[in-house]
Protein backbone atom coordinates (compact mmCIF):
# COMPACT_ATOMS: atom_id res chain seq x y z
CA UNK A 1 0.00 0.00 0.00
CA UNK A 2 1.14 3.49 -0.78
CA UNK A 3 1.30 6.56 1.42
CA UNK A 4 -0.60 9.24 -0.49
CA UNK A 5 -1.78 12.79 -0.03
CA UNK A 6 -5.25 13.97 -0.85
CA UNK A 7 -7.10 17.26 -0.67
CA UNK A 8 -10.23 17.85 1.36
CA UNK A 9 -12.69 20.69 1.88
CA UNK A 10 -15.18 21.04 4.69
CA UNK A 11 -17.82 23.09 2.91
CA UNK A 12 -19.70 26.17 4.21
CA UNK A 13 -22.73 24.19 5.41
CA UNK A 14 -20.68 21.91 7.66
CA UNK A 15 -18.49 24.78 8.92
CA UNK A 16 -21.61 26.80 9.81
CA UNK A 17 -22.96 23.85 11.81
CA UNK A 18 -19.68 23.50 13.76
CA UNK A 19 -18.87 20.04 12.40
CA UNK A 20 -15.16 20.73 11.79
CA UNK A 21 -13.92 18.89 14.88
CA UNK A 22 -16.18 15.89 14.34
CA UNK A 23 -15.06 15.61 10.71
CA UNK A 24 -11.39 15.90 11.67
CA UNK A 25 -11.95 13.15 14.23
CA UNK A 26 -13.27 10.89 11.45
CA UNK A 27 -10.20 11.55 9.31
CA UNK A 28 -7.83 10.77 12.16
CA UNK A 29 -9.80 7.74 13.38
CA UNK A 30 -9.46 6.31 9.86
CA UNK A 31 -5.68 6.69 10.00
CA UNK A 32 -5.38 9.85 7.91
CA UNK A 33 -3.07 12.57 9.18
CA UNK A 34 -3.85 16.25 8.65
CA UNK A 35 -0.58 17.73 7.38
CA UNK A 36 -1.91 21.18 6.42
CA UNK A 37 -5.10 23.08 7.17
CA UNK A 38 -6.55 26.56 7.02
CA UNK A 39 -9.87 28.38 7.04
CA UNK A 40 -10.62 30.37 3.90
CA UNK A 41 -13.56 32.46 2.71
CA UNK A 42 -13.39 31.98 -1.05
CA UNK A 43 -13.86 34.88 -3.40
CA UNK A 44 -15.98 34.33 -6.50
CA UNK A 45 -12.79 34.25 -8.57
CA UNK A 46 -11.16 31.63 -6.33
CA UNK A 47 -14.24 29.40 -6.44
CA UNK A 48 -14.56 29.75 -10.21
CA UNK A 49 -10.88 28.88 -10.62
CA UNK A 50 -11.05 25.86 -8.34
CA UNK A 51 -14.16 24.48 -10.04
CA UNK A 52 -13.19 25.58 -13.59
CA UNK A 53 -13.64 22.02 -14.92
CA UNK A 54 -17.37 22.39 -14.19
CA UNK A 55 -17.76 25.84 -15.78
CA UNK A 56 -20.02 24.59 -18.59
CA UNK A 57 -22.25 22.51 -16.30
CA UNK A 58 -25.71 23.83 -15.39
CA UNK A 59 -24.98 23.76 -11.64
CA UNK A 60 -21.78 25.87 -11.88
CA UNK A 61 -23.32 29.18 -10.79
CA UNK A 62 -25.08 27.63 -7.81
CA UNK A 63 -21.89 25.79 -6.82
CA UNK A 64 -19.82 28.98 -6.88
CA UNK A 65 -22.50 30.83 -4.93
CA UNK A 66 -22.64 28.09 -2.29
CA UNK A 67 -18.87 27.79 -1.96
CA UNK A 68 -18.56 31.56 -1.41
CA UNK A 69 -21.48 31.72 1.06
CA UNK A 70 -19.26 31.27 4.11
CA UNK A 71 -15.86 30.08 5.27
CA UNK A 72 -14.52 26.66 4.39
CA UNK A 73 -11.77 24.50 5.86
CA UNK A 74 -9.21 23.22 3.39
CA UNK A 75 -6.83 20.48 4.43
CA UNK A 76 -4.30 18.02 3.12
CA UNK A 77 -4.66 14.46 4.38
CA UNK A 78 -1.86 11.90 4.30
CA UNK A 79 -2.02 8.15 4.78
CA UNK A 80 -2.33 4.71 3.21
CA UNK A 81 -4.30 5.05 -0.03
CA UNK A 82 -5.48 8.47 1.17
CA UNK A 83 -7.52 9.33 -1.94
CA UNK A 84 -9.69 6.23 -1.73
CA UNK A 85 -9.78 6.24 2.07
CA UNK A 86 -11.11 9.80 2.13
CA UNK A 87 -13.70 9.05 -0.54
CA UNK A 88 -14.94 6.11 1.52
CA UNK A 89 -15.14 8.29 4.64
CA UNK A 90 -17.10 10.95 2.71
CA UNK A 91 -19.69 8.62 1.17
CA UNK A 92 -21.75 9.13 -1.97
CA UNK A 93 -22.12 12.66 -3.35
CA UNK A 94 -25.86 12.51 -2.72
CA UNK A 95 -26.33 12.10 1.04
CA UNK A 96 -29.59 10.22 0.42
CA UNK A 97 -27.46 7.50 -1.19
CA UNK A 98 -24.52 7.70 1.23
CA UNK A 99 -23.86 4.71 3.46
CA UNK A 100 -24.66 5.07 7.15
CA UNK A 101 -21.73 6.35 9.13
CA UNK A 102 -20.19 8.34 6.28
CA UNK A 103 -19.65 12.08 6.53
CA UNK A 104 -22.32 12.92 3.99
CA UNK A 105 -24.89 10.61 5.57
CA UNK A 106 -24.22 12.19 8.96
CA UNK A 107 -23.60 15.87 8.12
CA UNK A 108 -24.96 16.75 4.66
CA UNK A 109 -28.41 18.20 4.03
CA UNK A 110 -28.65 17.69 0.27
CA UNK A 111 -26.71 16.89 -2.88
CA UNK A 112 -26.00 20.62 -3.23
CA UNK A 113 -24.96 21.20 0.39
CA UNK A 114 -23.10 17.95 0.89
CA UNK A 115 -20.64 18.94 3.65
CA UNK A 116 -17.32 17.84 2.14
CA UNK A 117 -15.20 17.62 -0.99
CA UNK A 118 -12.36 15.21 -1.62
CA UNK A 119 -10.03 14.67 -4.54
CA UNK A 120 -11.10 11.86 -6.88
CA UNK A 121 -7.60 10.83 -8.02
CA UNK A 122 -3.93 11.45 -7.26
CA UNK A 123 -3.59 13.87 -10.19
CA UNK A 124 -6.52 16.00 -9.03
CA UNK A 125 -5.21 15.83 -5.44
CA UNK A 126 -1.88 17.30 -6.54
CA UNK A 127 -3.60 20.07 -8.50
CA UNK A 128 -6.06 20.89 -5.71
CA UNK A 129 -3.39 20.88 -2.98
CA UNK A 130 -1.27 23.28 -5.05
CA UNK A 131 -4.29 25.56 -5.55
CA UNK A 132 -4.50 26.26 -1.81
CA UNK A 133 -1.10 25.42 -0.31
CA UNK A 134 2.53 26.27 -1.04
CA UNK A 135 4.92 23.34 -0.67
CA UNK A 136 6.39 24.83 2.53
CA UNK A 137 2.94 24.84 4.17
CA UNK A 138 2.77 21.03 4.16
CA UNK A 139 4.03 19.55 7.41
CA UNK A 140 4.63 15.80 7.14
CA UNK A 141 3.92 14.08 10.45
CA UNK A 142 6.95 11.99 11.28
CA UNK A 143 6.16 11.38 14.95
UniProtKB/Swiss-Prot annotation:
SUPFAM superfamilies documented for this protein: Nucleoside diphosphate kinase, NDK
GO molecular function, one term: ATP binding
Cofactors that this protein relies on: Mg(2+)
UniProt superkingdom: Bacteria
GO CC terms of this entry: cytoplasm
Subcellular location, record wording: Cytoplasm
Residue stretches in coiled coil: none
Catalyzed reactions per annotation: a 2'-deoxyribonucleoside 5'-diphosphate + ATP = a 2'-deoxyribonucleoside 5'-triphosphate + ADP; a ribonucleoside 5'-diphosphate + ATP = a ribonucleoside 5'-triphosphate + ADP
Quaternary structure, from the entry: Homotetramer.
Known role: Major role in the synthesis of nucleoside triphosphates other than ATP. The ATP gamma phosphate is transferred to the NDP beta phosphate via a ping-pong mechanism, using a phosphorylated active-site intermediate.
Family: Belongs to the NDK family.
Name under which the protein is recorded: Nucleoside diphosphate kinase
